[in-house]
Swiss-Prot record:
Keyword Oxidoreductase: no
Organism field: Mus musculus (Mouse)
Record GO cellular component, one term: nucleus
Subunit relationships: Associates with PML and SP100 in the PML NB complex. Associates with survival motor neuron protein (SMN)-containing macromolecular nuclear complexes and U1 and U2 snRNAs and U3 snoRNA.
Cofactor dependency: Mn(2+)
Protein known as: Interferon-stimulated gene 20 kDa protein
Subcellular location: Nucleus; Nucleus, Nucleolus; Cytoplasm; Nucleus, Cajal body
pH dependence: Optimum pH is 7.0.
Molecular-function annotations in GO: exonuclease activity; exoribonuclease II activity; metal ion binding; U1 snRNA binding; U2 snRNA binding; U3 snoRNA binding
Enzyme class: hydrolase
Biological function: Interferon-induced antiviral exoribonuclease that acts mainly on single-stranded RNA. Inhibition of several viruses does not involve the degradation of viral RNAs, but rather the inhibition of translation of viral proteins. Exerts a translational control over a large panel of non-self RNA substrates while sparing endogenous transcripts. This activity correlates with the protein's ability to localize in cytoplasmic processing bodies. May also act as master regulator of over hundred interferon stimulated genes leading to viral genome translation inhibition.
Induction details: Induced by interferons alpha and beta. Weaker induction was seen with interferon gamma. Increased expression was seen at the transcriptional level.
Gene that specifies this protein: Isg20
Entry EC no(s): 3.1.13.1
Family: Belongs to the exonuclease superfamily.
Length: 300
């Protein structure tokens, strides 16, 4: 699968620094797609620690005795992330703590993926935590004890759960991409306003990389919504789809879709796009649940 970046998941813990208790990096863990730990160190931040946030971070003064200095840890972490696709939840906080420009990296952030929110029936929330997403979608409790980042006390490593979440939504995304891409004009595919679940080559790269690790299919739960067998139907083809040219997964034509399938958010963007109404077409109503879900996201 040439050209597919290596996928890693990163999770950081913070402490409060100075009188304003500004967040500083106190621990960073990185795992690869197979769940192997690539990095896990306590880090001594620059500045005086005024709040260890132990109840949330699990960090204590004892951890700082032999902690790696921030400057040294930062170089180690950034070297590990170089050239990789970084998966995480609310990654802007992690990169801020690393004093690094996040735009230099290829990332996938579960905190901004609205498709995940819809899957978990959390679409009306203004903010969604990783704990809640994992509870709703994976039926797992994470971060239940201080210091549970790497499974202390039987807890699950958040980075691994992020990858499982990514695979869960990725199965829907692959179906969407294969079905919908042939009907989207290049101008729409290139539009930065188009939901990432449809157009992003970055998303497809993540899914393709994940699809090469078949063991990650095992813990995937059946969704409570949608027709029975949805997961089985997709997971059986996931390996074959990885890195393959996109093609319609179902025999659906543009005519059956009652007009061009265009991004409603782009209306007026290039003068050629229209709003999509998923409720006014019998053909659309007959489409699989995973594709109808994406219609909702386009309109949203």
């Amino acid at each position: 699968m040439a050209g597919i970046p290596e996928v890693v998941a990163m999770d950081c813990e913070m402490v409060g620094l100075g009188p304003q208790r500004v967040s500083g990096l106190a621990r960073c863990s990185i795992v690869n797609i197979h769940g192997a730990v690539l990095y896990d160190k306590y880090i001594r931040p620059e500045g005086e620690i005024t709040d260890y946030r132990t109840q949330v971070s699990g960090v204590t003064p004892q951890h700082m005795v032999r902690a790696t200095p921030f400057g040294e840890a930062r170089l180690e972490i950034l070297q590990l992330l170089k050239g990789k696709l970084v998966v995480g939840h609310d990654l802007k906080h992690d990169f801020n703590a690393l004093k690094e420009d996040m735009s230099k990296y290829t990332i996938y952030d579960t905190s901004t993926d609205r498709l995940l929110w819809h899957e978990a029936k959390l679409q009306y929330y203004s903010r969604v935590s990783l704990r809640l997403l994992c509870k709703r979608l994976l039926h797992k409790n994470i971060q239940v004890l201080p210091g549970s980042l790497l499974g202390v006390g039987g807890c699950i490593l958040p980075g691994t759960d992020i990858l499982h979440l990514l695979l869960y939504v990725g199965m829907v995304r692959i179906a969407d991409l294969r079905l919908l891409t042939p009907f989207l004009p290049p101008s729409c595919l290139a539009c930065p306003l188009l939901p990432e679940s449809l157009a992003s080559a970055r998303s497809h790269a993540v899914i393709s990389a994940l699809s090469s690790s078949s063991h990650l299919l095992t813990p995937l739960p059946n969704p409570s919504q949608g027709p029975q067998g949805h997961v089985d139907r997709l997971s059986g083809q996931l390996q074959d789809w990885g890195g393959s040219p996109l093609a319609p997964a179902l025999p659906v034509s543009a005519e059956q879709l009652a007009g061009p399938l265009l991004c409603g958010r782009c209306q007026g963007h290039n003068g050629a796009l229209q709003n999509l109404s998923a409720t006014q077409s019998p053909a659309r109503a007959a489409l699989p649940w995973d594709v109808r879900l994406n219609f909702i996201l386009i309109q949203g």
